[in-house]
Amino acid sequence: MANGGGGGGGGGGGSSLRMSSNIHANHLSLDASSSSSSSSSSSSSSSSVHEPKMDALIIPVTMEVPCDSRGQRMWWAFLASSMVTFFGGLFIILLWRTLKYLWTVCCHCGGKTKEAQKINNGSSQADGTLKPVDEKEETVAAEVGWMTSVKDWAGVMISAQTLTGRVLVVLVFALSIGALVIYFIDSSNPIESCQNFYKDFTLQIDMAFNVFFLLYFGLRFIAANDKLWFWLEVNSVVDFFTVPPVFVSVYLNRSWLGLRFLRALRLIQFSEILQFLNILKTSNSIKLVNLLSIFISTWLTAAGFIHLVENSGDPWENFQNNQALTYWECVYLLMVTMSTVGYGDVYAKTTLGRLFMVFFILGGLAMFASYVPEIIELIGNRKKYGGSYSAVSGRKHIVVCGHITLESVSNFLKDFLHKDRDDVNVEIVFLHNISPNLELEALFKRHFTQVEFYQGSVLNPHDLARVKIESADACLILANKYCADPDAEDASNIMRVISIKNYHPKIRIITQMLQYHNKAHLLNIPSWNWKEGDDAICLAELKLGFIAQSCLAQGLSTMLANLFSMRSFIKIEEDTWQKYYLEGVSNEMYTEYLSSAFVGLSFPTVCELCFVKLKLLMIAIEYKSANRESRILINPGNHLKIQEGTLGFFIASDAKEVKRAFFYCKACHDDITDPKRIKKCGCKRLEDEQPSTLSPKKKQRNGGMRNSPSSSPKLMRHDPLLIPGNDQIDNMDSNVKKYDSTGMFHWCAPKEIEKVILTRSEAAMTVLSGHVVVCIFGDVSSALIGLRNLVMPLRASNFHYHELKHIVFVGSIEYLKREWETLHNFPKVSILPGTPLSRADLRAVNINLCDMCVILSANQNNIDDTSLQDKECILASLNIKSMQFDDSIGVLQANSQGFTPPGMDRSSPDNSPVHGMLRQPSITTGVNIPIITELVNDTNVQFLDQDDDDDPDTELYLTQPFACGTAFAVSVLDSLMSATYFNDNILTLIRTLVTGGATPELEALIAEENALRGGYSTPQTLANRDRCRVAQLALLDGPFADLGDGGCYGDLFCKALKTYNMLCFGIYRLRDAHLSTPSQCTKRYVITNPPYEFELVPTDLIFCLMQFDHNAGQSRASLSHSSHSSQSSSKKSSSVHSIPSTANRQNRPKSRESRDKQKYVQEERL
């Protein structure tokens, strides 16, 4: 055996731990024939001369081990044990297969003869059955069954599908690594050395390991289906060359390092072991571990072979050409060889080593060139946004998922993290299955203190656990508003809700929905509970609701959109329309509990005090009934008295301003004129806040809104006319259904679509006026936009029947047939088949006499180029604006008599009617036609007005069409996600304002039947009509004309509130009203919540919340025309509102209801 440092017995270049002296001294001690000193010297001298030759034959020994005194090498015995075991077993398996094959061939012919004989014997039987098998066959069957049972048992023992199997597999792998570690320790010893089994601790451990390997090998052999292939497996070969040498080592009392390095091949199974332990779950991690384990095991195994041959030498050279290399030097040599660097400091000297290196370079280089780059790529591409969220103590977090893009995230963060929200202590965790691009990543980095991103899917419970969804304050799901298939997008978001609710049913979810009819599917989720904060923001419902309200009060869509969006105040010194518009844009909607100083006061009184004293505009309160169910009452009137713990809804520019309503104290603040000085005083009633009354916040979160304070406000109604009296009920025809079952909307029996279709000539003969024209682009394949959401607010029951504006749809009849199922229960709806681009169709519906023209498109999402998504709407808008008309409105107005409120004389300037929409004397050009156009792409707003100077990069809310209320984009609804999270009643308030009275109960009914159900007029349903509505108050004439010319807005606010219970909240002003020279421009813009001292002009229109008028049950307008006189009368009068006169309520004629019914019957056919 070659020793270290060039000797024959050393291994690894170091001296043996089991030698008492150096090899030369051991050789001298074994020479028993030399006893004299001279002979000893001669012998020593002789041995020194021949040391290189004799050293190769010497085996290092110790005095305690009775080893071969001649130093004979026994490596061949260890190798022979492995070879005999391998080839012997292989020979036995092949011999068994050969004998089995011959037996099968020999018995095949005999089997055919016996089978034919059995068939013949069986056919000769009378009953036709075969004879039973003989006893020998039964014995064979029993033996086969016993063998199969043993085989199945062995298979179960080693299968990873059972706990025992997994334990065995893991244990075998662990012991294999242990045996490899022992090899690493022994590699510092000589390749072959004498050892005593009873005194060598490492040999005993190695022996125990290999006994276990032998037992496991037996189990694998029994369980193997194909013994031959099992015998040739890598793991079997490893056992052949590592297990038998250990037993030989015990027998010979010597050790040979040999092929024990093959245990490194067990590392290939490392990924399987980690999968058994449920550590590796992703494909990338499994692939990475596979590549690493194959690379490392091949590397260590090859290093072990080089270590063996280089320290031993070539056999045909009598082991004289060996060199002392440690195992780790061989590992280094193999690495520089695989990488083709080859420094030359370490190299192979033996022929076997060099021959192995030749073949290893070919395979190793290929493996290095393919495996290493792939490993680096997998490590580099590991989920940068993996890991788990670590919750911060005392800080809430929300999870945002769904449609995560640069646009959606930037819009969300802009509103959620707005500086006006001074109480935001919420961390935002985004979860998406696609890693962010560079722009989105940069956005996250800019908000790194409050934003974190994790890559994953909410459909995966493991990812939900990573973001701590169970401890999250809420989960927000964003929708792709520009997707080609809205129903598919809604289905995806519904699945996300199902997955999240299945993981944690109590989590609060706020999701965006595109289609109104898909909201019904959310009600099927058992844990979905809107009372606990779950909300679905339907973009189609709100978008069309906003547009519908603009049909009643032009510009309202812009005002409402700005109210729930967080906008910073932009100060402009120049006296331009932008100055006043931006001052109103900075106002938002806030909530705050009212001070106890307001207890016992009526709503108008508190509203006036807040506006005059606190500089706050309160528009609604939260009312909780006796059964603790909350309702939001918008401008409820003077019959309601404020109680302790009432929650108010305010329009203000800052959250700090709203706190004045909570801090106000009559004793301390009554004489204060500067509202900024109203702060928390030292009164005991403010210091001793009730625990149930939540801390004042501008955006009260879930529990504060849904859970009632200590006491609830009670409705104290003193007006008997709020609910119809017995005389009214007697005059009602209980068999006529005029309203739906909830009493919130006007209703009629379902009509066939053919009955409402007008030809162009019929439409021209019907002199329509004061109506709403809806230009709709769509075809048979377009996605439905839900026109019901546009019609419902225009059919709210707080309008009298004669006040309803007739709705005329102009568009493809194929598309409208698909929408008609949801529209056939609404009265005063007509359809003109055609196209909005046809001027003939537009003239047929008298578009120049309409109160509003709405332009919608259902084909917006089928175009890849976003700039072309709005091409149809833009073309239609420009087409209408370029039309010219005759001065025909004067003829119509000469035959019409506007509606005069009871007790008012139209001839008196002070008693002029309050108009809903102020009409121009005549419309001769399409530019003056009121139009609202829906846009998908915000940047396309620049094409609507050719005379504006808006920059293409200007934000939508700063553009002139949006400020004037002539354009609306669904993107403005993104702010509702943040607003709803901070205050879930904000969404309820917005929906109450824009949908005309849609409630969760009504949604459940529509989900059940997909249509409104008619109901009889009962006191309960008629009471639902008593709710305020939005209108526009004209200052050109009427009871407020004196304030229109230079008066203060605050005086108008107080007068309207005291006299008519009307709540003013904005101005719709001509764009050039601030100019000293008259202008022909008829464009108007929105001013939200102007200050008290704001100066009015006569042409202003005032946005107001008007009370329901019980005295306006009959239309007094009549408009004669050729064939549809009653229909046209209703159209013209639909644009006229009245102020309720409390002095004349008691003098209402009892026959009013009967006249109402007659008129209803006349127009029912429409």
UniProtKB/Swiss-Prot annotation:
Keyword Nucleotide-binding belongs to the record: no
Signal peptide: none
GO function terms (MF aspect): actin binding; calcium-activated potassium channel activity; large conductance calcium-activated potassium channel activity; metal ion binding; potassium channel activity; voltage-gated potassium channel activity
Phosphothreonine modified-residue sites: 139, 693, 900
Membrane topology according to the record: Multi-pass membrane protein
Consequence when changing residue 139 to V: Loss of phosphorylation by CaMK2 and, therefore, inhibition of channel activity in response to ethanol
Note: The protein was initially thought to contain two functionally distinct parts: The core channel (from the N-terminus to the S9 segment) that mediates the channel activity, and the cytoplasmic tail (from the S9 segment to the C-terminus) that mediates the calcium sensing. The situation is however more complex, since the core channel also contains binding sites for Ca(2+) and Mg(2+).
The protein's name: Calcium-activated potassium channel subunit alpha-1
